[in-house]
Amino acid sequence: MAKESYKRDKPHVNIGTIGHVDHGKTTLTAAITLVLSKQGLAQERDFGSIDKAPEERERGITISTAHVEYQTDKRHYAHIDCPGHADYIKNMITGAAQMDGAILVVAATDGPMPQTREHILLARQVNVPSLVVFLNKVDIADPELIELVELELRELLSQYDFPGDDIPIIKGSALKAMEGDAEGEKAILELMDAVDAFIPDPVRDVDKPFLMPVEDVFSISGRGTVGTGRIERGRIKLNEEVEIVGLRPTRKSVVTGIEMFQKLLDEGQAGDNAGLLLRGVDKTELERGMVIAKPGTIKPHTKFKAEVYILKKEEGGRHTPFFNGYRPQFYFRTTDVTGSVTLPEGVEMVMPGDNLAIEVELLAPIAMDEGLRFAIREGGRTVGAGSVTKINE
């Protein structure tokens, strides 16, 4: 059977289910596929197939993630669901599964629990732009309790700078929907309407300002210096001005040639592996770890705050804790830079398996924005992962 071609007739959005263990994230994911499959908009996936999520490696970290796809009348969705709490933390911090929005699942019988809070905080820290809430198990909860849980949730969301008063909270039962109950199914359709309406269309990478990390550098005799890499975002056209940012003082240049697979192009765009010929740049002035970007859109920094996850020993991480002043390498995009770590007040040491907020000072400046992901390495071995939450300098 020939492969079906991917139709781009609807906006594509990446979402996922987040929330406390056993509140019904995977059951809800299965229920969405079941209900939408009845309209021909999804292939039904049972709980077991989602729960046995395959392992993936992202920035040297093994994460179990299930990928499910479905459509509504308005959009095409790629939906991720993780079996374990640690998988969520790793997923959100490494950006392995970038989410444009998330469905926060809360059991009405329990209300917000520690992981509910932690997932909301992480969603805020790693820039998940918006949340919709599914209040699950309402069929077995006391109606008065449901109202209290809703109030508590709105307060909790507001506490972490989400619009708690405006976020849609859909009440339902994922299990009832799985059993084919009409009320149960109606709640799932309501949830998908809320997701369609409340989670904004993502800005496509192509429409963002141009940026390409430099992976390799070579010179063409008589023509100049070429930087190669995969274009991360935006587009670049011939004779456009660019800035070279990171490691050394920022400098300007002009792109006089764009090459891809040995062919010359007029334009390169996000996702392309390209070589850019740069006017007036010496081979010694360009190196791996710099970025070539649209002027004025990104600056080099050395000091930042980050949310990090430190690998357990079983995951190939450190066997021992580390302390204030720890100096590993931070791997940004294409290169390692040494940096020193300041722990939050009151934290004496960090154990393998912990996730926490730290401050970092790098030895050399790197082009960065808030939300940039990195790996923490020691001698080429990954011992952690992180996301820049605030730039200090």
UniProtKB/Swiss-Prot annotation:
Residues 10-203 form the tr-type G domain. Its EC number is 3.6.5.3. Keywords: Cytoplasm, Elongation factor, GTP-binding, Hydrolase, Magnesium, Metal-binding, Nucleotide-binding, Protein biosynthesis. Gene3D superfamilies: P-loop containing nucleotide triphosphate hydrolases, Translation factors. Pfam families: GTP_EFTU (PF00009), GTP_EFTU_D2 (PF03144), GTP_EFTU_D3 (PF03143). Residues 60-64 are annotated as: G2. It catalyses: GTP + H2O = GDP + phosphate + H(+). Residues 136-139 are annotated as: G4. GO terms for cellular component: cytosol. Residues 81-84 are annotated as: G3. Residues 19-26 are annotated as: G1. GTP binds at residues 19-26, 81-85, 136-139. Its main location: cytoplasm. GTP hydrolase that promotes the GTP-dependent binding of aminoacyl-tRNA to the A-site of ribosomes during protein biosynthesis. This is Elongation factor Tu. The lineage of its organism: Bacteria, Pseudomonadati, Chlorobiota, Chlorobiia, Chlorobiales.
